[in-house]
């Protein structure tokens, strides 16, 4: 609000004034009698006082009536203002030239005492000819055509400057107006707040209806209490928290869409009244309680008084929103950590595969030089696995060491799915899982884990997660059909998903049929998302049925019994006993039972030996061979020595016998001496 001392004259005195406006045009410097005088009499309406409020689209002006002479001189392009002595006495400190169709500011002589000057509703394009009015306190140029702020450098006492509804594009030339109290620049074309930081006494700033897109550069306005920024294009606000006295801030009808763009308002301790209506943010459901929660000092929001109930509700909703944000932030962090961990596991997996590929290439070169026969273990022919005996490439080793500082595996439970990334995740199966969580898991996914490592934990998987029905394998190095044999030890499988990425076995045309054949006792429903039909089961049996028969027929009976589990041994013995019976004795039902048992038994002989187990077996065989060789060599050596000793004895014995007889005859030749000698020996022994 404009201070009372800056308002126009109000009251009855102004209402009763009926003055005439005298416009005198002087064409030359002729005597007074040659002047042509035009008189326009009118009743001027009163202006009791204008308020510079937050919606200051009207401007302060004074409509007092004056008897004014504007003289146009041939020596100057500006009209010269003249007032009578009576008018100067009556309105000594103010002058109103409102609605005079002025295009320039007239020359005002002899009016150095003026304090209020009104040029409202004219066509003035430039501020000039007022530098001599150094006592001027209020200057009103509302509704003109001014394009630049100028001509004010000498008005050091100016307190109120009203330049609303003009064509000003830039705030400038206010350096000397350090006493300015009210600055109205609404309805112009200003795009940036600038050059006002020195106005430390400014209390009211109106920049409504301009082209501002952001609010900043407000430092130094230590006395500012009201800031009107309505009807702009503002998207974010800064530096408002640096205004210690700001109480009223009007941001209606802008483009503010989030509280983060005006977060500095929360740090303002003096702000009590603010408006956001007409902004996108005001349409949000969280708008009111967010503003109230962050600006506890507010008394009014959007011109409505804030109640204690609204504050309480805002506090409750804000707490819920904060908890939601924290949870969302936590989930985002977990997702990012998951992404980084999976990427790291993938890098380690790629390095490992590259290392294995290099070792395999070296082994192939060695094999080409010295071919080896495939080894037989437990009657089953196994493909030879390359032994990891070669040194690790230095570059790969350094890369692995660099990655070791980050998480190298990930265990994730999402609903009913347990996802394991990296071989280290298999250790999670040793944890104490709650009964509720373990019973909830129905899908287990393996990614970036060697299948041979997975095989070793399948017994634990069966025990820890008894309800698991769906297995997924991605980047697990499934390379041959025999590996599917290992899945037979599980309790149940309804679905099986083998991702083509990192599992070359899916390139085999018949891999699905082999899975159905080998795991037929599970009665699987889907493979890679495709329903299993009865025709698929029949085709699988036709393709691979003979394989199980051949495998079982090649093994001896003791090996078959050792392969079968305890639960099947009785059935297998029954099968062996029934082989000796005549076909006529066995009824139809026993034949069906024998066929079923025979199928399960035959399939059980198709097992899979992991690379580690295979290497252990190789080491065991090598150790046995080494022991046997050493043992036989020792036996041969000992037998050879015995034989040599025996031959030597045979050669020496005749001469030894003669010498023994001779010594005995000589010893007993003197009977008395011999007896004494024997008696002496007996005495010595005692």
UniProtKB/Swiss-Prot annotation:
Keywords: Coiled coil, Cytoplasm, Cytoskeleton, Leucine-rich repeat, Microtubule, Repeat. The keyword Cytoplasm applies. PROSITE patterns: LRR. Residues 360-388 are annotated as: Disordered. Residues 303-341 form a coiled coil. Residues 279-317 form the LRRCT domain. It holds the Pfam family LRR_9. LRR repeats lie at residues 113-134, 135-156, 157-178, 179-200, 201-222, 223-244, 245-266. Gene3D superfamilies: Ribonuclease Inhibitor. InterPro entries: Cilia_flagella_integrity, Leu-rich_rpt, Leu-rich_rpt_4, Leu-rich_rpt_typical-subtyp, LRR_dom_sf. It is found in: Cytoplasm, Cytoskeleton; Cytoplasm, Cytoskeleton, Microtubule organizing center, Centrosome, Centriolar satellite. One of its GO terms (cellular component) is microtubule. Subunit of the tubulin polyglutamylase complex (TPGC). The complex mediates cilia and flagella polyglutamylation which is essential for their biogenesis and motility. Part of the neuronal tubulin polyglutamylase complex which contains TPGS1, TPGS2, TTLL1, LRRC49 and NICN1. Interacts with PCM1; TTLL1, TPGS1, TPGS2 and LRRC49. This is Leucine-rich repeat-containing protein 49. The gene is LRRC49.
């Amino acid at each position: 609000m404009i201070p009372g001392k800056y308002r126009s004259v109000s009251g009855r005195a102004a209402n009763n004034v009926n003055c005439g406006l005298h416009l005198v045009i002087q064409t030359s410097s002729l005597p007074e009698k040659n002047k042509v005088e035009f008189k326009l009499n009118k009743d001027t309406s009163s202006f009791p006082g204008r308020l510079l409020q937050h919606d200051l689209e009207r401007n302060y002006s004074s409509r007092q009536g004056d008897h004014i002479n504007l003289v146009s001189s041939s020596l100057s392009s500006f009209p010269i203002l003249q007032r009578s002595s009576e008018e100067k006495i009556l309105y000594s400190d103010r002058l109103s030239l409102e609605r005079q169709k002025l295009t320039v500011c007239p020359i005002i002589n002899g009016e150095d005492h003026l304090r209020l000057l009104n040029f409202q509703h004219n066509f003035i394009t430039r501020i000039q000819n007022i530098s001599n009015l150094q006592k001027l306190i209020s200057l009103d140029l509302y509704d003109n055509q001014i394009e630049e702020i100028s001509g004010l450098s000498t008005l050091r006492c100016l307190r109120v400057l009203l330049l609303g509804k003009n064509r000003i594009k830039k705030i400038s030339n206010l350096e000397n107006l350090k006493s300015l109290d009210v600055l109205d620049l609404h309805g112009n074309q200003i795009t940036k707040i600038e050059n006002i930081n020195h106005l430390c006494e400014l209390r009211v700033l109106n920049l409504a209806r301009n082209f501002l897109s952001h609010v900043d550069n407000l430092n130094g306005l230590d006395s500012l209490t009201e800031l009107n920024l309505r009807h702009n294009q503002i998207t974010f606000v800064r530096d408002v928290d640096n205004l210690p006295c700001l109480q009223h801030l009007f941001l209606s009808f802008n483009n503010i869409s989030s509280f983060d763009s005006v977060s500095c308002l929360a740090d303002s301790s003096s702000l009590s009244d603010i408006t956001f209506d007409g902004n996108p943010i005001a349409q949000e459901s969280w708008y009111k309680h967010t503003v109230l929660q962050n600006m506890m000092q507010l008394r009014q929001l959007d011109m409505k008084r804030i109640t204690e109930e609204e504050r309480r509700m805002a506090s409750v909703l804000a707490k819920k929103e904060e908890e939601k944000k924290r949870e969302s932030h936590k989930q985002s962090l977990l997702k990012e950590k998951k992404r980084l961990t999976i990427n790291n596991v993938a890098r380690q997996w790629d390095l490992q595969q590259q290392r294995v590929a290099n070792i395999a290439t070296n082994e192939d070169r060695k094999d080409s030089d010295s071919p080896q026969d495939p080894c037989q273990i437990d009657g089953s022919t196994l493909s030879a696995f390359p032994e990891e005996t070669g040194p690790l490439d230095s570059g790969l080793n350094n890369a692995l060491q660099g990655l070791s500082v980050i998480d190298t595996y990930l265990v994730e439970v999402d609903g009913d799915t347990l996802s394991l990334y990296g071989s280290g995740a298999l250790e999670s199966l040793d944890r104490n899982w709650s009964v509720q969580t373990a019973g909830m898991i129905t899908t287990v996914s393996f990614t970036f884990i060697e299948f041979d490592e997975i095989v070793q934990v399948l017994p634990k998987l069966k025990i820890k997660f008894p309800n698991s029905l769906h297995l997924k394998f991605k980047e697990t190095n499934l390379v041959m059909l025999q590996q599917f044999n290992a899945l037979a030890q599980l309790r149940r499988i309804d679905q099986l998903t083998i991702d083509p990425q990192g599992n070359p076995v899916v390139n085999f045309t018949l891999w699905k049929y082999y899975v159905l054949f080998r795991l037929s006792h599970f009665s699987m429903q889907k493979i890679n998302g495709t329903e299993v039909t009865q025709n698929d089961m029949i085709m699988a049996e036709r393709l691979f049925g003979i394989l199980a028969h051949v495998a079982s027929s090649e093994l001896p009976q003791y090996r078959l019994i050792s392969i079968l589990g305890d639960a099947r041994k009785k059935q297998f013995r029954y099968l062996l006993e029934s082989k000796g019976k005549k076909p006529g004795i066995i009824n139809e039902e026993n034949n069906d039972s024998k066929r079923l048992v025979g199928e399960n038994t035959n399939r059980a002989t198709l097992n899979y030996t992991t690379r580690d187990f295979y290497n252990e077996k190789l080491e065991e065989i090598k150790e046995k061979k080494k022991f046997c060789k050493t043992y036989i060599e020792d036996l041969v050596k000992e037998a050879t020595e015995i034989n040599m000793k025996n031959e030597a004895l045979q050669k020496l014995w005749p001469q030894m016998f003669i010498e023994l007889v001779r010594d005995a005859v000589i010893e007993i030749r003197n009977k008395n001496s011999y007896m004494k000698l024997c008696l002496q020996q007996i005495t010595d022994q005692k």
